[in-house]
UniProtKB/Swiss-Prot annotation:
Its cofactor is pyridoxal 5'-phosphate. InterPro entries: GcvP, GDC-P_C, GDC-P_N, GDC_P, PyrdxlP-dep_Trfase, PyrdxlP-dep_Trfase_major, PyrdxlP-dep_Trfase_small. The glycine cleavage system catalyzes the degradation of glycine. The P protein binds the alpha-amino group of glycine through its pyridoxal phosphate cofactor; CO(2) is released and the remaining methylamine moiety is then transferred to the lipoamide cofactor of the H protein. This is Glycine dehydrogenase (decarboxylating). It comes from Agrobacterium fabrum (strain C58 / ATCC 33970). Pfam families: GcvP2_C (PF21478), GDC-P (PF02347). It comes from the Bacteria. Belongs to the GcvP family. Gene3D superfamilies: Aspartate Aminotransferase, domain 1, Type I PLP-dependent aspartate aminotransferase-like (Major domain). One of its GO terms (biological process) is glycine decarboxylation via glycine cleavage system. It catalyses: N(6)-[(R)-lipoyl]-L-lysyl-[glycine-cleavage complex H protein] + glycine + H(+) = N(6)-[(R)-S(8)-aminomethyldihydrolipoyl]-L-lysyl-[glycine-cleavage complex H protein] + CO2.
Length: 954
């Protein structure tokens, strides 16, 4: 008889520690993997991989790791320090109701939030359709021809609009006009963007201060930040007469009732879709939009979803006109944008699908009527309301009573907007209740009931909308929640995300987004805080941001962090601006040269161009390392004007370079600063710190290293860390410190997703984060070893190791049997995998990054699939398979292939069920291989007519 083990309570350890869940391989599996790699211990592998010259001297420690429950309790305690009042502050941020069917089935659904940017369109058809709906909705409401699939926020979109105006204008002027009625954060970002490019920004009343001859473009706010609704038709016509371009920042909800920018003649419309069901979240994330006239579509920044056909001629969606983007055109790109806000754009599009045009118009009418009722009550109290006609925002002159009324409103549970020294503004919205109006009246000294007033309209009659919008059937088919739920499910079933399989994209770090980390983002204490509330109402946010910043400083060796950049590309831009402003403050106005290796990610040169720097490329050696001799030569050659260098570490080739310290020393010797791209930080956390190596500034991709999900192409966060001498030059914001240099609309970027990264740090602890880095390196080296022999691993260190990712060479297959890297990628779809990163940083190769979250079983399944693909290529090489009609060339295979007529020289079994593919719950690509050329030559970027859907169903 077995004696039970004696249990002592002091031995008890909770089982819900995150590192037990987050790290994929078990200790026994790690031992097996280490044996394959050739090391007896994980530490021995790390010692052989990470150069001792850069190793972190002090372990990463900041207290014990918390369990999931303890971390959630800590988050709840912190969230409760935020005060959730009703905010009528407006200024581009409004209360909205997220339909529960959208919250549960999209925002909280890993099938949507764990997907990657849809570069592989065959396995992204659901998301692409949702984004096409978004583009269609935006085009209809703005009255323009083509819309993109989102930008980062409204203010950033305005800055992008200015840059686009300059690109396409026939005018040779160097100034840009900004309507003084634009939101303050919009004006601030435009000024930030214009300064390094040498453009003058003129701010004023467009009806009295704008001379079209003086500008290459202008932007107008519609309605204005203080409520004015103006007709810009005449001004736009005058701008066109001088070759200038007109942009309008428009409220989508208002456009259901008001004449569209397109009908006024605008070339560009921008704005935010936040009030279409996306919580304010202390400033973000939200999806901005941009729409343009057809003539300007190739100059528009951001992703653009278009319609094409697959190999069977069936309709299929894809990203169109990608040659405009930074990964192709580099410093000549339209923008440095990499991804934007796909998840939030999907939510906004579904808001439109669910409510339809009648529902959205009804919400707009109710919002306007609330504003009119508010105005009537204040007028009864003797106050004068500005403007006379408005949509949702009014401004009240209160004189010396401003402070008293604002405080009284807060006591009533309402935040109002301080306007100048003597006025108060308020913006009504979908969530405004009758009790809120009565509370505001009390704050002004009145004691009215909403029943005391009759609603009416105060919209300008000559600007009432008469044109139709959202007429496509998709906006009329899903009013019943049962149908809406099924529609969302049908779309998600067409996509491949982390909830189905590993996504081994190199330089993308598709790691686990733990459910416990995601839970707090929908708590009202985080999601319902306006970004411009008084500081004492956001003490929980301050505590979280301060602690996360401190932890990131500990991880990186930097002295200060700014959370403002709301993407990695925006982080690069902010970091380079910080360097530029540092040089300007120290007399270095001439320092404008940026050294960038030719292997760098396309955002690097694109970002450098945006801050007015001249990009000087540096050679890369055959082994993938920066050519130190060429770097030294260029640094000496441009020493007088050297501003900085931009490097990635580990390198973009997936190797820890031994010369990184020397590169930093050379740069500093010649007066430059070092920008170290933090995209590969998942290989460094706990092992090496950029600030110790010699770097001056980095951005971190919190949506990579620190677990914020990619959302199918956003949201992201790209906070920047700097050494102490650069800290005074970090981005400011007009609503907080009043300093210049804002790079995002909100002071802290997209803070409502920061609980994800903070809880990840709390639950992993310093020791857990370090272990995660080590396992990420183990997993990458294990894959390199397993694929060795079948494929060449292009870049390794002197010890034969890779960092957290590896590049395998598929070019020999193209030479031996005509199999391209695209064929390999599409065949992986048949196996149930998203392809690794294709043709970057080396054309014709695959960059593989498994992350620490993947189990040995999943990694082995991927390796088995890759090895099977090599054997299929060998069949072609040795004549056992037709060179043009084989599983690789015909991939991906669909259900239609399986059940249709089969005229191929290989079996259905071989085509549809390759090694690595699950049989019972296999993922089937919804379309065959998509024709990219057709899609660009026959560009359609709005929903096809209903007949196309009917034809597809036949």
């Amino acid at each position: 008889m077995t004696t039970p083990t004696e249990f002592h309570f002091t031995d008890y350890q909770p089982y819900d520690f995150a590192n037990r869940r987050h790290i994929g391989p078990s200790p026994s599996e790690m031992a097996e993997m280490l044996k394959v790699v050739g090391y007896k211990s994980l530490d021995a592998l790390i010692d052989a991989t990470v150069p001792s010259s850069i190793r972190q001297k002090v372990p990463l420690t900041w207290g014990a790791a918390l369990t999931e429950r303890e971390a959630l309790d800590r988050l709840r305690e912190t969230a409760n320090k935020n005060q959730v009042l009703t905010s009528l502050i407006g200024q581009g941020y409004y209360g909205t109701i997220t339909p529960p069917v959208i919250q549960r089935n999209i925002l909280e659904n890993p099938a949507w939030y764990t997907a990657y940017t849809p570069y592989q369109p065959e396995i992204s058809q659901g998301r692409l359709e949702a984004l096409l709906n978004y583009q269609t909705m935006v085009c209809d409401l703005t009255g323009l021809d083509v819309a993109n699939a989102s930008l980062l926020d409204e203010a950033t979109a305005a800055a992008e609009a200015m840059a686009m105006c300059q690109r396409v204008a026939k005018s040779k002027a160097t100034a840009f006009f900004v309507d003084a009625n634009c939101h303050p954060q919009t004006i601030a970002l435009i000024e930030t963007r214009a300064a390094p490019l040498g453009w003058k920004v003129i701010i004023g009343n467009p009806f009295t201060d704008l001379d079209p001859v003086d500008v290459f473009g202008a932007i107008f706010q519609y309605p204005g930040t203080h409520g004015h609704v103006s007709d810009f038709t005449g001004l736009i016509s005058r701008l066109h007469q001088t070759g200038a371009i007109a942009a309008v920042a428009a409220d989508l909800l208002a456009l259901t009732l008001l004449k569209s920018p397109g009908e006024m003649g605008a070339d560009i419309a921008i704005g935010t879709s936040q009030r279409f069901g996306v919580p304010v979240g202390y400033g973000g994330p939200h999806a901005a939009y941009m729409s343009v006239k057809d003539a300007h579509k190739r100059s528009m920044p951001g992703r653009l979803v278009g319609v094409s056909v697959d190999a069977r001629g069936n309709r299929a969606y894809r990203l169109s006109l990608q040659t405009r983007e930074q990964h192709i055109r580099r410093e000549k790109a339209t923008s440095n944008i990499c991804t934007a806000q796909v998840l939030l754009a999907v939510m906004a599009s579904m808001y439109g699908v669910f409510h339809g045009p009648q529902g959205i118009k009804a919400i707009a009418q109710q919002t306007h009527q609330k504003a009119v009722l508010m105005a009537k009550g204040l007028e009864k109290l003797g106050y004068t309301i500005e403007p006379e006609t408005f949509f949702d925002t009014i401004t009240v002159e209160v004189g010396h009573m401003q402070g008293v009324i604002l405080r009284s409103a807060v006591a009533e549970g309402v935040n109002l907007r301080k306007v100048g020294a003597t006025k108060i503004g308020m913006s009504l919205d979908e969530r405004t209740r009758p009790a809120t109006l009565e509370a505001v009246w009390r704050a002004f000294g009145g004691n009215f009931s909403i029943s005391d007033f009759e609603p009416d309209y105060r919209l300008p009659k000559d600007l009432l909308r008469t044109s139709q919008y959202m007429t496509h059937p998709i906006f009329h088919m899903n009013r019943a929640e049962s149908e809406m739920t099924r529609y969302i499910r049908r779309l998600s079933d067409r996509d491949l995300a982390l909830d189905r399989s590993m996504i081994p994209l190199g330089s993308c770090t598709m790691k686990l987004n733990a459910t416990a980390e995601m839970l707090p983002i929908t708590w009202p204490e985080f999601s319902d805080i306006h970004p411009f509330v008084p500081a004492n109402q956001a003490l929980g946010y301050k505590e979280m941001i301060d602690d996360l910043s401190e932890k990131l400083c500990s991880v990186t060796g930097y002295d200060a962090f700014s959370m403002q950049p709301n993407s990695g590309a925006q982080g690069e831009y902010a970091g380079l601006l910080t360097i530029r402003n540092y040089h300007l403050a120290n007399g270095g106005t001439h320092r404008d040269v940026c050294l960038i290796p030719t292997s760098a990610h396309g955002t690097n040169p694109a970002s450098a161009q945006m801050v007015g720097m001249k990009v000087v490329p540096v050679k890369v050696r055959d082994n993938g390392d920066i050519d130190i001799d060429d770097f030294r030569l260029k640094a000496e050659q441009y020493a007088e004007n050297l501003s900085c260098c931009m490097i990635t570490y580990p390198s973009t080739h997936g190797v820890f370079e031994e010369t990184v310290r020397e590169i930093c020393e050379i740069t500093h010797k010649h007066g430059g600063q070092v920008y170290l791209d933090g995209a590969n930080m998942n290989a460094m956390v706990g092992l090496a710190r950029p600030g110790d190596i010699g770097s001056d500034v980095s951005h971190l991709n919190l949506h990579k290293t620190f677990c914020i999900p990619h959302g199918g192409g956003g949201p992201g966060m790209g906070p920047i860390g700097v050494k102490a001498h650069l800290a005074p030059f970090l981005p400011g914001h007009p609503t907080t410190d009043g300093r210049e240099g804002a790079v995002s609309a909100a002071p802290f970027g997209s803070p409502s997703i920061l609980p994800i990264s903070w809880s990840y740090c709390l639950m992993m602890g310093g020791e857990g984060l370090t272990q995660a880095t080590k396992v990420a390196i183990l997993n990458a080296n294990y894959i390199a070893e397993r694929l060795k022999g079948a494929y060449d691993v292009l870049y390794k260190s002197e010890t034969g190791r890779v960092a957290h990712e590896c590049i395998i060479d598929t070019r020999p297959l193209a030479d031996s049997c005509g199999v391209t890297v695209d064929d390999v990628a599409k065949r992986l779809i048949d196996c149930g995998f998203h392809a690794p990163t294709m043709s970057w940083p080396v054309a014709g190769t695959l960059m593989i990054e498994p992350t620490e979250s993947e189990t040995k079983a999943e990694i082995d399944r991927f390796c088995d699939a890759m090895l099977a693909i090599r054997e299929e290529a060998r069949d072609i090489e040795e004549g056992r398979a037709d060179k043009n009609n084989n599983p690789l060339k015909n991939a991906p295979h669909t259900v239609e292939d399986l059940v249709g007529e089969w005229d191929r020289p290989y079996s259905r079994e071989k085509g549809c069920f390759p090694p690595g593919a699950f049989r019972i719950d296999k993922y089937w690509s919804p379309v065959n291989r998509i024709d990219n050329v057709y899609g660009d030559r026959n560009l359609i970027c709005t929903c096809p007519p209903m007949e196309a859907y009917a034809e597809a169903a036949e």
